[in-house]
């Protein structure tokens, strides 16, 4: 692979001054916007036009955490190495295989006028903020251009691209297999399951006859802000906004609510290409013909310790299936995924303005959501489940969970499936719908879609413990309220341990009396034997079970087992008594070493800490933290707290899981309660940096001030954006 480097003496440029036309335009936009901060620091942005609201919300987001906005765009544009150096090089190359600034600029140029106006206003809001705040020093992006919004247009594209291994890219394009192997891979137990919980309850199962919606994304902490944006053009949406995007990603408006959960549908495929070289050129076999391999040059700037930058140049390859990402067994592997930023941005925005199910489904016809299921509820009493709208039609005789033969035309994608050909639900007789990143075939209990009716590629993950838990808390209830839906979302039962621990206890009981482990493990086994599988701050069994589970998880993930088994099946059926008992001994030893006893309350171990505004926190046992009762979602907890030990710590500190959580009631007037991890501001000096932490850890959701009369009496500040 071609790979060259040359030094560029590029100093970090200071923020540019606003030109007179810019400043005049910003003043007009700012005058049309009012930002109201409530007593939690949450921005309620009102504009005359939709574009004015976008200007104001971009400005408000920048006030709260500009660093996260810039970092998200450095990532989405493939420019992170300009700020973070060599460690981000292969991540940038991965992004640039799919995201081409020239194409995004062309997409912007052909955008409908209404969308151009939104992108223009978004860039204006961020640039006006930088001009008004010279004390803020961007790491790289000193001026935002409207087309950049298309690089971060939907929740799907980033997650899909991230399936490509940077280790494989380094081995292939860097011609550096040894360096690729040296990339740090954390233990599998550190990887918190990505995704979310969504639940919709029909009016017939609620106390007051109103549909209810649970919005419970599991993301890295502080990944999204919470705000409201409204206009005189019909916009009035509230919810979670990923830093730097200009649409409510998960939330609600006056009439409808939508919750996205990461899907198990197969929408990213790999094609094994047979490569031939003829006349100094590269070709790949397709049917009986040879097609030329497409090549293009990508240049990436990489920051050095002296603040200069090195330019790295790559020649990258693609077939009609997509970019080539690795060599496997002599075949080049090309990746196919959704890459339609213009329709994606339109769908992401327009669904926030939909006022009923028909309007929402019309927007879904953009088919530009690939990685998310949707749980929906509205004020007409409808509840619904949607599978991703971007689902390629394929020949189901091929196993697309593995690379398929790219030379066989029968493996090609055959367009996109109509929405009604994917699993979906509307007002099932059960009266409830959920998704926990599991398959759709249990979403409404006995009224769920039937697996036999759909191709295999509609799901690759099967059931999970959270799905079993959701079914448990929903079944048989007919009196749901906002409060009881919150209780369900924070129900402490851990179904994974309810399956795994009886097997461990049986292993122990089967030991002969002469086995040394019989005495050594008697106390820990007694503690676990009497447990009700419920987490809690004072629960000692939770600590022991989680330590045991994490150790066994890492061991089980390395076992060479038959395909088709989940990690839970491997732990229960393949790990064996010795591995399970040894993991318990190791867990007890670790607790004794770190905490002085194997009987330690879970709240002493599991902590929430936010002491600075860094995107990657450095945790410290000596600094303030608060106990968290809920566990990782891998054990079936609906409320998720992805935590583990960090360098220099004994305690577990969380970085992902419950982030923004909301429950919404669709009555005559929409009513909601919500919570955000930590607080709204990324500034440690702000009183809203960590003011929600205790409520977050206890599930004590606060009232949402959606209506003007609800906001009245809770206003800290009302202002127009300050522009130079």
What feature does the model see in each segment?
Residues 115-214, 219-220, 367, 379-383, ...:
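Acidic, low-complexity N-terminal propeptides/linkers enriched in Ser/Thr/Asp/Gly that mediate export
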Residues 20-225, 232-234, 239-247, 252, ...:
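Substrate-recognition/specificity elements adjacent to catalytic centers across diverse enzyme folds
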Residues 234-245, 251-256, 260-404:
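Glycine- and hydrophobic-rich flexible loops that cap the catalytic core of alpha/beta enzyme folds
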Residues 239, 268, 369-477, 552:
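Hydrophobic alpha-helical segments
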Residues 84-119, 123-135, 304, 327-328, ...:
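N-terminal leader/propeptide and maturation segments of large enzyme subunits in energy/redox metabolism
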Residues 2-11:
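Bacterial N-terminal signal peptides
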Residues 16-18:
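Boundary at the C-terminal end of the N-terminal hydrophobic targeting segment
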């Amino acid at each position: 692979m071609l790979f060259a480097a040359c030094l560029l003496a590029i100093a970090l440029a200071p923020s540019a001054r606003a030109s007179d036309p810019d400043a005049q335009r910003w003043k007009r936009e700012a005058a049309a916007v009012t930002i109201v901060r409530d007593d939690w620091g949450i921005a309620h942005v009102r504009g005359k036009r939709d574009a004015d609201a976008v200007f104001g919300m971009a400005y408000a987001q920048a006030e709260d955490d500009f660093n996260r906005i810039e970092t998200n765009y450095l990532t989405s544009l493939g420019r992170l190495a300009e700020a973070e150096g060599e460690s981000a090089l292969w991540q940038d190359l991965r992004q640039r295989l799919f995201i081409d600034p020239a194409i995004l600029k062309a997409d912007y140029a052909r955008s409908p006028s209404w969308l151009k106006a939104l992108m223009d206003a978004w860039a204006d809001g961020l640039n006006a903020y930088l001009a008004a705040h010279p004390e803020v020093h961007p790491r790289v992006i000193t001026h935002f251009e409207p087309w950049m919004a298309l690089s971060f247009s939907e929740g799907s594209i980033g997650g899909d691209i991230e399936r490509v291994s940077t280790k494989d890219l380094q081995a292939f394009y860097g011609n550096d297999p040894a360096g690729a192997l040296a990339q740090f891979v954390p233990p599998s137990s550190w990887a918190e399951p990505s995704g979310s919980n969504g639940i919709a309850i029909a009016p017939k199962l609620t106390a007051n006859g109103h549909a209810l919606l649970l919005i419970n994304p599991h993301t890295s902490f502080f990944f999204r802000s919470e705000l409201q944006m409204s206009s005189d053009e019909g916009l009035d949406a509230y919810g979670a906004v990923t830093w730097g995007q200009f649409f409510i990603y998960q939330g609600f408006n006056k009439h409808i609510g939508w919750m996205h959960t990461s899907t198990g549908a197969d929408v990213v495929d790999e094609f094994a290409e047979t490569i031939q070289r003829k006349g100094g050129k590269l070709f790949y076999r397709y049917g009986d013909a040879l097609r030329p391999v497409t090549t293009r040059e990508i240049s990436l700037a990489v920051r050095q310790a002296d603040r200069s930058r090195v330019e790295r140049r790559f020649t990258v390859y693609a077939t009609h299936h997509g970019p080539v990402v690795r060599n496997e067994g002599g075949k080049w592997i090309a990746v196919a995924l959704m890459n339609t930023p213009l329709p994606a941005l339109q769908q992401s925005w327009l669904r926030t303005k939909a006022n009923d199910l028909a309007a929402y489904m019309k927007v879904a016809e953009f088919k530009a959501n690939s990685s998310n299921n949707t749980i929906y509820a509205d004020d007409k009493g409808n509840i619904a489940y949607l599978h991703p709208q971007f689902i390629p039609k394929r020949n189901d005789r091929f196993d697309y969970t593995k690379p398929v033969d790219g030379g066989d035309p029968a493996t090609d994608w055959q367009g996109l499936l109509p929405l009604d050909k994917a699993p979906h639900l509307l007002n099932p007789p059960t009266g409830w719908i959920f998704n926990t990143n599991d398959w759709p075939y249990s979403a409404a209990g006995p009224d769920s879609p039937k697996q036999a009716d759909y191709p295999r590629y509609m799901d690759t993950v099967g059931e999970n413990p959270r799905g079993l838990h959701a079914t448990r808390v929903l079944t048989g209830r007919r009196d749901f309220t906002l409060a009881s839906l919150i209780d369900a979302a924070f129900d402490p039962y851990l179904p994974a341990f309810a399956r795994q621990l009886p097997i461990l206890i049986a292993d122990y009981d089967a030991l002969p009396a002469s086995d040394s482990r019989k005495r050594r493990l008697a106390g820990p086994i007694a503690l676990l034997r009497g447990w009700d599988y419920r987490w809690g701050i004072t629960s000692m069994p939770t600590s022991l079970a989680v330590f045991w589970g994490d150790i066994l998880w890492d061991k089980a993930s390395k076992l060479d087992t038959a395909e088709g088994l989940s990690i839970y099946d491997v732990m229960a059926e393949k790990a064996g008594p010795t591995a399970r008992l040894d993991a318990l001994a190791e867990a007890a030893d670790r607790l004794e070493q770190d905490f002085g006893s194997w009987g330690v309350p879970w709240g002493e171990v599991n902590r929430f800490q936010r002491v600075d505004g860094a995107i990657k926190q450095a945790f410290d046992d000596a600094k303030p933290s608060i106990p968290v009762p809920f566990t990782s979602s891998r054990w079936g907890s609906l409320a998720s707290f992805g935590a583990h030990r960090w360098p220099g710590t004994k305690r577990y500190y969380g970085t992902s899981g419950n982030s923004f959580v909301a429950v919404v009631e669709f009555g005559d007037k929409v009513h909601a309660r919500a919570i955000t991890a930590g607080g709204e501001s990324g500034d440690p000096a702000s009183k809203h940096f960590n003011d929600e932490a205790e409520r977050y850890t206890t599930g004590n959701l606060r009232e949402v001030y959606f209506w003007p009369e609800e906001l009245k009496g809770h206003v800290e500040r009302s202002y127009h954006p300050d522009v130079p």
